[in-house]
Amino acid sequence: MAKGQSLQDPFLNALRRERVPVSIYLVNGIKLQGQIESFDQFVILLKNTVSQMVYKHAISTVVPSRPVSHHSSNTSVGASVGNYHSGGVSAPAAQQESDGTE
């Protein structure tokens, strides 16, 4: 489990420390926006006009409003990690591939 947290924790911590506004896309397509107030192994506390506890298992994508630097040996994180999309690519748009007609 520690290996899985080696990218997630520094990334979320950098977003929290720098108070970077984020868009969080849930697996059902809902978009939440705010700043990460805190997080643990299972939840992220997202603050906007109110604080919301968002369970990580419900999150598809976390999109920062600007690039952040975090302590990781891999600097091209956006190109290799499925839970991070740079450039504002939204998860719902990427889900629809075809309508099944030929």
From Swiss-Prot:
Sm domain: residues covered: 9-68
Keyword terms: RNA-binding, Stress response
One GO CC annotation: cytosol
GO biological process: regulation of DNA-templated transcription; regulation of RNA stability; regulation of translation, ncRNA-mediated
One Pfam family cited in the UniProt record for this chain: Hfq
Disulfide linkage: none
Top-level taxon in the UniProt lineage: Bacteria
Biased composition (Polar residues): 93-102
Chain positions covered by the region annotation Disordered: 65-102
An example molecular function term from Gene Ontology annotations: RNA binding
Function: RNA chaperone that binds small regulatory RNA (sRNAs) and mRNAs to facilitate mRNA translational regulation in response to envelope stress, environmental stress and changes in metabolite concentrations. Also binds with high specificity to tRNAs.
Subunit structure: Homohexamer.
Similarity annotation: Belongs to the Hfq family.
Protein name (record): RNA-binding protein Hfq
Organism: Photorhabdus laumondii subsp. laumondii (strain DSM 15139 / CIP 105565 / TT01) (Photorhabdus luminescens subsp. laumondii)
